[in-house]
From Swiss-Prot:
Family of this protein: Belongs to the universal ribosomal protein uS7 family.
Name listed for the protein in its UniProt record: Small ribosomal subunit protein uS7
GO CC term, one of those recorded: small ribosomal subunit
Record CDD domains: uS7_Bacteria
Alphabetical keyword list: Ribonucleoprotein, Ribosomal protein, RNA-binding, rRNA-binding, tRNA-binding
InterPro entries: Ribosomal_uS7 (IPR000235), Ribosomal_uS7_bac/org-type (IPR005717), Ribosomal_uS7_CS (IPR020606), Ribosomal_uS7_dom (IPR023798), Ribosomal_uS7_dom_sf (IPR036823)
Assembly and oligomerization: Part of the 30S ribosomal subunit. Contacts proteins S9 and S11.
The protein's role, per its UniProt record: One of the primary rRNA binding proteins, it binds directly to 16S rRNA where it nucleates assembly of the head domain of the 30S subunit. Is located at the subunit interface close to the decoding center, probably blocks exit of the E-site tRNA.
A GO molecular-function descriptor: rRNA binding
Phylogenetic lineage: Bacteria, Bacillati, Cyanobacteriota, Cyanophyceae, Synechococcales
Source species: Prochlorococcus marinus (strain MIT 9313)
Length: 156
């Protein structure tokens, strides 16, 4: 770890196309090898597909999907006297959002066939409807935290 001061957090600017901070964060997570324009196109196409299928505002659905996939608690490993305990801890809002976006992108990539924009649109629609792999992952995370509640006093 660096001995210097922690890097200053830079504010996330809203995306010029969608005027939304979450969209900017999603584009950053989608991007591979610095190809930002490709990531922007994938997100725009996914929003287009969502608009076609639902007829609603894709930005609202996207925000709902992220909210539904955001974990409130997680378990972190803590070593105490030779034993490693899974200690449940609350997740800060910023980290929770980052985890939700990461899960949405990863599970979209893991879906079968079709283009990335179609897979992303499907995952976002599932997450907005409290279904899909990203929401299931959040539920698993919450279950793990619940199961290890006895070690909550080891929090740091």
């Amino acid at each position: 770890m660096s001995r210097r001061n922690a890097a200053e957090k830079r504010p996330v600017l809203p995306d010029p196309q969608f005027n939304n901070r979450l969209a900017t964060m999603m584009i950053s997570r989608l991007m591979k090898h610095g190809k930002k324009s490709t990531a922007q196109r994938i997100l725009a196409q996914a929003f287009g597909l969502i608009n076609e299928r639902t007829g609603g505002d894709p930005i609202e659905l996207f925000e709902t999907a992220v909210k539904n996939a955001t974990p409130l608690v997680e378990v972190r490993a803590r070593r105490v006297g030779g034993a490693t305990y899974q200690v449940p801890m609350e997740v800060r809002q910023e980290r929770g959002t980052a985890m939700a976006l990461r899960w949405l992108v990863n599970f979209s990539r893991a879906r079968n066939g079709r283009s990335m924009s179609q897979k992303l649109a499907a995952e976002l629609m599932d997450a907005a409807n409290e279904a899909g792999s990203a929401v299931r992952k959040r539920e698993e995370t919450h279950k793990m935290a619940e199961a290890n509640k006895a070690f909550a006093h080891y929090r740091y």
